[in-house]
């Protein structure tokens, strides 16, 4: 089927229907997101910082786990393949994922790891500060082998994997190489959310989804100019071509914040998709929504342009919500009105 430059609501509905019968495997750093909500009405006499009056707290699955819950929110089945600690944060994360209908049979608890937890303090609809609790140790060889085996088993039912690298130690080069080998063996689609400071060989992947800053870092090029029209941004286009050629990617999807996203394919002109967000309250986890929705759409038979447009619509919905949010099929289809 020839690639389209637009996506109708009817076609989006058809993709979502097909996706409801698919399974996507998710691996990488599964984290717990804690939100403390409060109000600020004065500055502390102890230091020039706001005093937040506590109102409530909430917890959500974060990192690669947020990709999984974004998939199930869209009625696509998701398997979580990761390692978390045998601690309270790990227990809470597992419960949250099960509540979100994520398959957690391959979510391994380990005494040697701490579950990564990000605590965000929010007042007046703005994030005041974030506190990170994490070990960041590389995954032990034995646990890596267990994860690899579980992914291999999962590929008997799925042909798509999302790999979320948040620099917390799950994604090592050895583990990534094994996933690539399995991808080749099973002809599976491999989507990767990169962390440039975590230097890895990203060749032979189907898709990577860096933001602008990450794309320039991956290419080793200084981002000295920025054109409000991405297709006329010579430096950006140069970076995308270099990454496509260097890594042998099928798709490069660069997220550009308020400028939308740029989808690039070998031998084709880059295609710009403007943002659809009307109001932006919180970008936490928006990248997870993009990579999850795109991969789900590809698994459901969408072409890359259709998948990118659908992912852009999904991102436009979640950034209008506070917290690590997801989008439902109804919300996604309503965004086409």
Regions found by a protein language model. Name each.
Residues 242, 246, 250, 276-335:
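Conserved post-catalytic alpha-helical subdomain immediately downstream of the catalytic base
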Residues 157-170:
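Short acidic, glycine-rich surface-loop motifs adjacent to enzyme active sites
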Residues 169, 173-270:
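Conserved phosphate/ATP/ADP-binding segment of small-molecule kinases
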Residues 30, 166, 289:
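Active-site metal-binding loops of divalent metal-dependent hydrolases
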Residues 1-41, 336:
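Positively charged, low-complexity intrinsically disordered leader regions
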Residues 5-15, 45, 49-116, 332-335:
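Substrate-binding N-lobe of the ribokinase-like
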Residues 107-113, 120-155:
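Conserved phosphate-binding/catalytic loop of the ribokinase/pfkB sugar-kinase fold
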Residues 25-27, 130, 159-162, 191, ...:
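Structural motif
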